[in-house]
Amino acid sequence: MFIYDTKLKQKVPFEPLVQNKANIYVCGPTVYDDAHLGHARSAIAFDLLRRTLELSGYEVMLVRNFTDIDDKIINKALKENKSIQELSSIYIESYTRDLNALNVKKPSLEPKASEYLDAMVGMIETLLEKNIAYQVSNGDIYLDTSKDKDYGSLSVHNSSIEFGRIGLVQEKRLEQDFVLWKSYKGDNDVGFDSPLGKGRPGWHIECSSMVFETLALTNTPYQIDIHAGGADLLFPHHENEACQTRCAFGVELAKYWMHNGFVNINNEKMSKSLGNSFFVKDALKNYDGEILRNYLLGVHYRSVLNFNEEDLLVSKKRLDKIYRLKQRVLGTLGGINPNFKKEILECMQDDLNVSKALSVLESMLSSTNEKLDQNPKNKALKGEILANLKFIEELLGIGFKDPSAYFQLGVSESEKQEIENKIEERKRAKERKDFLKADSIREELLKQKIALMDTPQGTIWEKFF
């Protein structure tokens, strides 16, 4: 298994800290709004990583957090006259619904930052004791990055423009010094009583503490195998996580760092500041979650994905082929490449090379259908074919529906009954040899985007886009 390590900037063999086990921490959302396609892409990318590792024989522990203490949450909660707990719980539920619709496997653990305040305070106390952290006059506590000789080694970022994003404070020793603890500033602020005084943790200390509490190994030079997240988190978030972990514990946070690429909308980076965010819940109004998942996984996870509906509909054809084959093999069977599972898994073991994996999948679908055409009555390989289709489901998280349910997505029960009535009416017209009437019914349904297919078992139908 090979993965691309952001820190080394190259593909490297995956060699876990504990044989046949993989510990992964994925930075989850700050829960002050609904999930957008960038959140969905990150979740799907590392869901693919997890599935690939599991099918390669690893026991995977994947933790994805919720940041439920943050300035954005506080500001929105104040604006909407809610507590931060009320607001964050709304968006945690929304995020969970969206990811369930995208068939993302539930993490092993989903810690909330608010549940690990003691660990955060303890880590900050350690940094103060080591004289690596310092307090300014308003009570805020910062980490002195000059004490970490390896600061910047992950992101190779030293741009003053980037440091400007962090915000300049007059008493900070260096521009890149980052806040560990924000002291309580009075009304409209949120604070928790602690040995550090009343206040709340900074963003970066939250994730490091949760890694340490949920996944960290003892007596190793690294705390976990893989730390993952979106490319936008590389700096300053992941750089600062790595820094404070070295300073507090004398170890590296992760052996490997993985980052997924951005989602662009009309060739422009998707962001709330640009007003072009595309929420998952809105996309799900137009497309089934499996169709959306199939599209988002179709571009290599490290590449930028330029979202557009034309490409989404093109990618849906791949999903159609999977279900078309599944539909055929459930009744009529033929042969399939016996090395298919090995070949497609090897593609995914090469830094999640999904493009190559999908090429192997396309080849399998094509060759299997050809064999079915040549020998439609061969049932000897039914188990093998269905097992390979099941493998696609487990590896890529697609192809798990019943074919009839997939091809009839977006059709209500009352509409289904009307279609079945029309099919029965058409059948009677053909029995009377009233072929004009039969053709008119077919044309009528086509206008409703319903295609009819006559098979030896009877007429079946499907909805098209």
UniProtKB/Swiss-Prot annotation:
Keywords: Aminoacyl-tRNA synthetase, ATP-binding, Cytoplasm, Ligase, Metal-binding, Nucleotide-binding, Protein biosynthesis, Zinc. ATP binds at residue 272. Its EC number is 6.1.1.16. Changing residue 434 to N: In strain: NCTC 11638. One of its GO terms (biological process) is cysteinyl-tRNA aminoacylation. Monomer. NCBIfam families: cysS. This is Cysteine--tRNA ligase.
